[in-house]
């Protein structure tokens, strides 16, 4: 009744530490990670979203 690799339809994924190599094959990062890829970048700015940057003052770096 369930998948022998991932135990679907069980709620949690099937994983065993006695097979380290198998874990490595299917851990996070072996796929696209559509969502997780961008998390570190968003974490750096405290997950701020949809705000506009404050306007810089006129003669900041150009006056050298």
Curated annotation (Swiss-Prot):
<keyword id="KW-0699">rRNA-binding</keyword>
<keyword id="KW-0862">Zinc</keyword>
<dbReference type="GO" id="GO:0003723">
    <property type="term" value="F:RNA binding"/>
</dbReference>
<keyword id="KW-0694">RNA-binding</keyword>
<dbReference type="InterPro" id="IPR011332">
    <property type="entry name" value="Ribosomal_zn-bd"/>
</dbReference>
<feature type="binding site">
    <location>
        <position position="6"/>
    </location>
    <ligand>
        <name>Zn(2+)</name>
    </ligand>
</feature>
<comment type="function">
    <text>Binds to the 23S rRNA.</text>
</comment>
<keyword id="KW-0687">Ribonucleoprotein</keyword>
<dbReference type="GO" id="GO:0022625">
    <property type="term" value="C:cytosolic large ribosomal subunit"/>
</dbReference>
<feature type="binding site">
    <location>
        <position position="3"/>
    </location>
    <ligand>
        <name>Zn(2+)</name>
    </ligand>
</feature>
<feature type="zinc finger region" description="C4-type">
    <location>
        <begin position="1"/>
        <end position="6"/>
    </location>
</feature>
<dbReference type="InterPro" id="IPR011331">
    <property type="entry name" value="Ribosomal_eL37/eL43"/>
</dbReference>
<dbReference type="Pfam" id="PF01907">
    <property type="entry name" value="Ribosomal_L37e"/>
</dbReference>
<dbReference type="GO" id="GO:0006412">
    <property type="term" value="P:translation"/>
</dbReference>
<dbReference type="InterPro" id="IPR001569">
    <property type="entry name" value="Ribosomal_eL37"/>
</dbReference>
<keyword id="KW-0689">Ribosomal protein</keyword>
<keyword id="KW-0863">Zinc-finger</keyword>
<keyword id="KW-0479">Metal-binding</keyword>
<dbReference type="GO" id="GO:0003735">
    <property type="term" value="F:structural constituent of ribosome"/>
</dbReference>
<protein>
    <recommendedName>
        <fullName>Large ribosomal subunit protein eL37</fullName>
    </recommendedName>
</protein>
<dbReference type="GO" id="GO:0008270">
    <property type="term" value="F:zinc ion binding"/>
</dbReference>
<dbReference type="GO" id="GO:0019843">
    <property type="term" value="F:rRNA binding"/>
</dbReference>
<comment type="similarity">
    <text>Belongs to the eukaryotic ribosomal protein eL37 family.</text>
</comment>
């Amino acid at each position: 009744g369930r998948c022998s690799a991932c135990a679907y339809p069980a709620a949690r994924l099937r994983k065993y530490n006695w097979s380290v190599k198998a874990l490595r094959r299917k851990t996070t990062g072996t796929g696209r990670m559509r969502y997780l890829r961008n998390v570190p970048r968003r974490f750096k700015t405290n997950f701020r979203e949809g705000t506009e940057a404050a306007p810089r003052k006129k003669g900041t770096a150009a006056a050298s």
